[in-house]
Regions:
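Structured beta-strand/turn binding interfaces of compact recognition modules in eukaryotic regulators
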Residues: 6-8, 36-41, 54, 63, ...
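Local sequence-structure signature of Cys/Sec-based thiol-disulfide redox active-site neighborhoods
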Residues: 1-32
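Non-catalytic, surface beta->alpha helical segment in thiol-disulfide oxidoreductase systems
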Residues: 62-91
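Thiol-based oxidoreductase modules, predominantly thioredoxin-like and allied folds used
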Residues: 27-47, 55
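Structural micro-motif
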Residues: 2-4, 51-62, 68-71
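Short amphipathic alpha-helical molecular recognition features
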Residues: 14-18, 36, 40, 58, ...
Length: 91
């Protein structure tokens, strides 16, 4: 999955405001993305913050690289960086 969002809930039913904002940003970028609901996957919810060295969710990965959470996504979206990064991904 080249664009992967670890989030609370699903894009159709996000379970927190940050996850909702992250999915809205990704949808606005216009490319298909995958997601993992960490509420349904407690092992991932416990392990990923340690592995990624990022304590909160959502977490966006593009081509295996951690981009950040919803605040970073919003900043990058507003300045055009995120759309460019996503546009460069071949799915």
């Amino acid at each position: 999955n080249k664009i992967l969002l670890y989030m609370k809930g699903s894009p159709d039913k996000p379970q927190c405001g940050f996850s909702q904002r992250a999915t809205q940003i990704l949808m606005a970028c216009g490319k298909e993305f995958s997601f993992v609901d960490i509420l349904s996957n407690p092992d991932i919810r416990e392990t990923l913050p340690t592995v990624s060295n990022w304590p909160t969710f959502p977490q966006l990965y593009i081509e295996g690289e951690l981009i950040g959470g919803s605040d970073i996504m919003m900043d990058m979206y507003q300045n055009g960086e995120l759309k460019k990064l996503i546009d460069d991904v071949e799915i």
